[in-house]
């Protein structure tokens, strides 16, 4: 992360962290409003689709067990870069695939990517919160919520005229470039 004074929380740092949380919410919630399109791409029944969706938890649980050590070793900034790149790639694959097997692999990897990003961003924020002696994480989670809401609004506006593949690919590339 950028070097800021450890004893104070500057507005530029608040802005950077808000962008990080906003973009995280925007990206990881982008598939939720398009789940009917994901199911249609896979041509599976509801039970199978629910099972396929739940496989992301495998990657998430594994990363929750080892993510702290990874972030400690490579740093929060690098972990967020890796996480955001992996989220972008796996979400693009999820939006394009018609194969349940490919979907499972991408889903597991996306769960891991989301977890490492979350561990790195929240861990860094909690560390800064301790350093400056101010509660800052609730506002940043508010930025995450605004990003998630923006993702739903984008999906509402484009779903009728834009395929899930174009929608998610475009959004992931834009978010990744900004991140």
Kindly label every feature range from the protein language model.
Residues 29, 56-65, 148-149:
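Residue-level signature of mid-helix packing/kink "hotspots" within the transmembrane helices
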Residues 35, 67, 147-159, 163, ...:
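Small-residue (Gly/Pro/Ala) motifs that create kinks and tight helix-helix packing interfaces
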Residues 21, 50-57:
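Short hydrophobic/aromatic, small-residue-rich stretches within specific transmembrane helices
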Residues 166-179:
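Symmetry-related core transmembrane helices of the 12-TM Major Facilitator Superfamily/SLC fold
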Residues 8-36, 40, 108-109:
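Pair of pore-lining "gating" transmembrane helices in MFS-fold secondary transporters
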Residues 106-142:
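Cytoplasmic helix-loop-helix junction between adjacent transmembrane helices
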Residues 43-50, 138:
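Small-residue hotspots at the loop-to-helix junctions and early N-terminal turns
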Residues 62-101:
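Conserved MFS/SLC helix-loop-helix module at the cytosolic interface between two early adjacent transmembrane helices
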């Amino acid at each position: 992360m950028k070097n800021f004074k450890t004893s104070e929380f500057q507005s530029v740092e608040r802005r950077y962290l808000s962008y990080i949380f906003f973009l995280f919410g925007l990206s990881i919630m982008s598939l939720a409003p398009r789940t009917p399109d994901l199911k249609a791409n896979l041509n599976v029944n509801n039970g199978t689709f629910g099972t396929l969706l739940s496989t992301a938890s495998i990657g998430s649980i594994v990363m929750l067990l080892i993510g702290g050590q990874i972030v400690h070793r490579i740093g929060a900034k690098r972990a967020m870069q890796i996480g955001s790149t992996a989220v972008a790639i796996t979400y693009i694959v999820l939006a394009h695939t018609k194969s349940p097997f490919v979907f499972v692999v991408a889903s597991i990897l996306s769960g891991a990517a989301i977890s490492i990003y979350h561990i790195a961003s929240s861990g860094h924020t909690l560390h800064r919160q301790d350093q400056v002696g101010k509660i800052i994480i609730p506002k940043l989670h508010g930025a995450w919520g605004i990003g998630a809401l923006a993702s739903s609004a984008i999906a509402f506006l484009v779903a009728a005229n834009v395929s899930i593949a174009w929608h998610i690919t475009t959004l992931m590339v834009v978010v990744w470039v900004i991140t």
